[in-house]
A protein has these predicted regions:
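Single conserved hydrophobic/aromatic residue that forms the stacking wall/gate
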Residues: 1-9, 13
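Catalytic Walker B motif of ABC-type/P-loop ATPase nucleotide-binding domains
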Residues: 33-37
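Helical segment within the ABC ATPase nucleotide-binding domain
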Residues: 48-60
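H-loop/switch region of ABC-family ATPase nucleotide-binding domains
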Residues: 69-70
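A short, surface-exposed alpha-helical micro-motif characterized by mixed small hydrophobic
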Residues: 75-77
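ABC ATPase nucleotide-binding domains
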Residues: 102, 106-128
Length: 128
């Protein structure tokens, strides 16, 4: 129990620190944002809130947002362009619909991938 409480406290601190860093970036009011794994240490609720905020910055304030993500489904949901990397090399760079394809993702991840459509977007899952 003690370790669990410590872990929760550390995750809460990291979550708040991430928000402070994002606020500092936004205060600079640049035309672009470069974010490396901004969803790390965020629960699903806060990760979605952050991605919606970034979408608002793009749509309403004409910001350019470049994000490094390892969660292909967040990329499928929010990105309009994906650069998929494999072994340190560009595997495919194209609009989201061209990248989120079963064959391409199976080659990228080297596991069976199935796609399901939700709200007009493709999402992937695997049970391996």
């Amino acid at each position: 129990l003690h370790l669990s409480l410590r872990r929760q406290r550390q995750m809460c601190i990291r979550d708040r620190l991430q928000r402070v860093y994002l606020a500092m970036i936004l205060a600079q009011d640049t035309d672009y944002l470069l974010l490396d794994e901004p969803l790390n240490n965020l629960d699903l609720k806060h990760a979605n809130q952050l991605m919606k905020l970034l979408t608002t910055l793009v749509e309403d304030y004409q910001k350019t947002v470049v994000i490094v993500l390892h969660d292909i489904n967040f990329a499928a949901r929010y990105a309009d362009h994906i650069v998929a990397m494999k072994d340190g090399q560009i595997f495919k760079a194209a609009d989201t619909e061209a990248v989120i394809q079963e064959q391409l993702l199976e080659s990228l991840y080297e596991i069976p991938i199935k796609l399901v459509q939700v709200d007009g977007r493709q999402f992937c899952y695997t049970f391996q």
